[in-house]
Amino acid sequence: MENLSERFNALQDLLMNIYEAAEQTLEAQIKHWQTLRQEAVLLYFARQRGVTRLGYQPVPVKAVSEAKAKEAIAMVLQLQSLQTSEYASETWTLVDTSIETFRSAPDGHFKKGPVPVEVIYDNDADNANLYTMWTYVYYMEDDVWHKARSGVNETGIYYLQGTFKYYYVLFADDARKYSQTGQWEVKVNKETVFAPVTSSTPPGSPGGQADTNASSKTSTTTTATVDSTTKQLTTSEQPQQTETKGRKYGRRPSSRTRRPQAKQRRSRSRHRSSRSRSRSQSRSHTPTTRSATTRSRSPSLAKTGVQRVSTRSRSRSTSRRGGRRRRSRSPSTSSSTTTTNKRSRVRAETTGSRGARGGRGARGGSGGGRRRGRSSSSTSPAHKRSREHSVRSRGVSPDQVGKSLRSVSSKHTGRLGRLLEEALDPPVILVRGEANTLKCFRNRAKIKYMGLYRSFSTTWSWVAGDGTERLGRPRMLISFSSYNQRRDFDDVVRYPKGVEKSYGNLDSL
C-alpha cells in the first residue's frame, strides 16, 4: 500500500513538472503520454488489489483505468510515428497532442490552428452553429505522414488530400435539423464569406450552378413555380390545340380518372365503331336482305371464324365497355327484333368456336375471350416451377456462375437449390473506415486469416459526380469464393473499432 502511494506521488510530481515546463517539442509530448500510461496502469493494479484510495486520490474502477491506458498507448504510437516524419521539428503543444483534439473532426488526425466558423440558418442570428476549421491537418497515407490545409465553402469544411477535397463537416446535415427553409449563411471570423445558399440545389451540385450575384440565388421551388406558370400561360394561349387533342390527354370535370390502357381501348373502339356505322348505314336500306344473309352465313361463320363478324363483335363489346353503347350501334338495328336475335346467335357461336381454337381471333372477342387469349400465350406458374426445378436438378453450368444479380430468397428453396442459386452471385463484404485502419486490417488478415477469403482490394473512395472531392470514408472490398466461406470469415474475424461492414454480390470479379 505504501509503495503504491509513493509510486503514484512520484508520477504526479513528474506530470506537474511537464505542465510547468510547457515544452513545445514532440519529445516532451511523448514523455507526457508515457507518464499518463504509467499512471493508468498503476491505478488499474491498485483497484485489482482492492485499493480504493491512494492518499487523497480515489481509485477509479478498472474499466476506466483500462480505457485511459489504451488511449495513452495509442497516442504514444501515433506520436512516435510522427516523430519519424519531416514534421517532427515543428512546434507541438499539449493542446495539439491532446486526445480531445485528436478525436475532433476529422477524427484520428493531428490538427493545428483552429479557426471558428459560424453558420446562420434561415437568416436568424439566434439560429446558428459554431464549427472549428483547422488550418493544418496531418494525416497518414501508405505509412507516410502528409500535411494539408483546410478550407471552407458553401458545402462544408474540408482539407485537401492532393487534389481531392475531404469534407469533415457538411452544413446540409445540420440544416435538416435546425433549418426550416434549407438556407444558411457562412461566416469566418465574423465576416460573411458565403451569402445565404439553399440545401436543395447547392452550388456545384448537378442540379444547380454557383452564381456570384445575390439576386440570382433563388430556390428550386421558386424556379419550378415560374416554369409551371409559364407552361399554363402557353397552354391557355393555344385553346384550339387543346380541343383538338380532346379527351386523349385531358379529362372532363365530370368524368372519372381512367388508366392509359382504357384510353387506348377507347381510341381503338372509336375507330372500329366508325367503320361499323359506315357498314351498317350502307346496309340499312335492306334489313330483310341483311337478315337473310346473316341466316345463310351463320353456319360458315361458326366453322371458319370470318374476320368480318369478329370485327363487328369486337367493336360492340369494346364500345359497350367504354360506355358508348348507343354510338357504336347502327341506326338500323332497332328496326328488326328477329335480326338482332340472329346476330346474337351468330356472335355466341363465333365466340365458342374462337375459344375452342385459342387463336389470334380470340383477342378481338369479348372481355373474357381477350383474357383467355392472353393467359394461354403466357407461361403458367406450374411451367415456371417445373423449369426452375429442372434447373436445380441439372445444376449450374460453369458459364452461368456469377451471372445472377438478384439476392437469393430464403423461401421455398431447399438447401441444394439455395446453394445452386448462390453460386450465381460471387459474395463480397464492403468495409468502411479510416484508410490506415483498413490497410492494417488487410495486412493482419493476410497473416491470421489466410484461406478464409479470396482476395482484398485496395482502399478507395467515391468521388462526387460534379467535382473531384472524395465522398464519405474510405472503403475496401473483400471477395469470397462461396457464401459458406464468407460466413466462416465473418464468424472468425474481429473487425477493428469504427469499421462498418455491409454485404453484397458482384456480377463478376
Swiss-Prot record:
A GO cellular component entry from the record: host cell nucleus
Gene3D superfamilies listed in its UniProt record: 3.30.70.330, E2 (early) protein, N terminal domain, subdomain 1, Papillomavirus E2 early protein domain
Keyword Transit peptide among record annotations: no
InterPro entries: E2/EBNA1_C_sf (IPR035975), Nucleotide-bd_a/b_plait_sf (IPR012677), Papillomavirus_E2_C (IPR000427), PPV_E2_N (IPR001866), Reg_prot_E2 (IPR033668), Regulatory_protein_E2_N (IPR036050), Regulatory_protein_E2_N_1 (IPR042503), Regulatory_protein_E2_N_2 (IPR042504)
Composition bias type Gly residues, residue spans: 355-368
Function: Plays a role in the initiation of viral DNA replication. A dimer of E2 interacts with a dimer of E1 in order to improve specificity of E1 DNA binding activity. Once the complex recognizes and binds DNA at specific sites, the E2 dimer is removed from DNA. E2 also regulates viral transcription through binding to the E2RE response element (5'-ACCNNNNNNGGT-3') present in multiple copies in the regulatory regions of the viral genome. Activates or represses transcription depending on E2RE's position with regards to proximal promoter elements including the TATA-box.
One Pfam family hit: PPV_E2_C
Biased composition (Basic residues): 247-282, 311-329
Family affiliation: Belongs to the papillomaviridae E2 protein family.
Biased composition (Polar residues): 232-243
Organism of derivation: Human papillomavirus 36
Subunit and partners: Binds DNA as homodimer. Interacts with protein E1; this interaction greatly increases E1 DNA-binding activity. Interacts with protein L1; this interaction enhances E2-dependent replication and transcription activation. Interacts with protein L2; this interaction inhibits E2 transcriptional activity but not DNA replication function E2. Interacts with protein E7; this interaction inhibits E7 oncogenic activity. Interacts with host TAF1; this interaction modulates E2-dependent transcriptional regulation. Interacts with host BRD4; this interaction mediates E2 transcriptional activation function.
GO biological process terms, semicolon-separated: DNA replication; DNA-templated transcription; regulation of DNA replication; viral DNA genome replication
GO molecular function: DNA binding; DNA-binding transcription factor activity; nucleotide binding
Principal place of residence: host cell
Keywords recorded for this protein, A-Z: Activator, DNA replication, DNA-binding, Early protein, Host nucleus, Phosphoprotein, Repressor, Transcription, Transcription regulation
Region: Transactivation domain, residue numbers: 1-200
Full protein name: Regulatory protein E2
